[in-house]
Amino acid sequence: MKSRLLSALLVLTLVTGATGALAATKGPRLYILDCGDIRPMDPTLFGLKKEEIAGDGSFVTPCYLVVHRKGTLIWDVGQVPDAQIPGDGTEVVVQDLLKARRKLVPQIEALGYHVSDIDFLAMSHYHLDHTANANLFAGSTWIVQQAEYDAMFGAREFAIRDSSSYDKLKDSKRITLKDADHDVFGDGTVVIKTAPGHTPGHQMLFLRLKNFGPLLLEGDLYHLPEERTLDRVPTFDFDAAMTRATRVKTEAFLKKTGAQMWIQHDPPTNAQLKKAPDYYD
């Protein structure tokens, strides 16, 4: 009897091992992962003058893992493919601009998850500093705006696009949205929000965290805080008027919900935040 009980417990452990941490969560958890840095860029690209910005024009590029009791979602997947990163701490620089020292997948695995455990993939937009490892998640359900899908795979050429990083998604399982929001797990705690302008189908991620409170990850709606305070739009946005309209709606949404907004690329913002294995819940 004792040996049967031990065998049963062993089987249960093997079956639930990958999902044990997920099942134990009472609300969503947000893990911030290190997906590199971007060398200083000319602030005029963002509608700003050098003397108008506080920093040197450099950026950070985080990735995010959301763990919900009903599943997992990866938000943005880096700027340098894991295959190009040695993984020994050596810095890799792509296009003399995008830097990375750490692979994405080992960071996920360190939290107890494998690529096959990621139920949903969502990226803010198709720019190459957000899509580098997208093909690794071709087995996940991809949440994308129709306009973004068309920009990614259509005949029209778009700047800052590297289709080789996401070409396996073309025929993958997906939830395609038509300029619409999407409640990922059906309880209002993890919501994809449409936010066009920077790209045709740019989107953001809204979270209702039990302890931290409501939070908005804004993709590239802003890159620098000064874009927000001085009302400047990057010169390379797909549609500046659309960006401005999205910003107005977003500011109203923040006021209505009381949500914090993290500017994903902003180094000072990122420096203050807890990184995986710590999390926000």
Predicted regions and their residues:
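Cap/insert and terminal regions of metallo-dependent hydrolase folds
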Residues: 25, 94-106, 206, 211-281
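Active-site metal-binding loops of divalent metal-dependent hydrolases
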Residues: 35-36, 77-80, 126, 147, ...
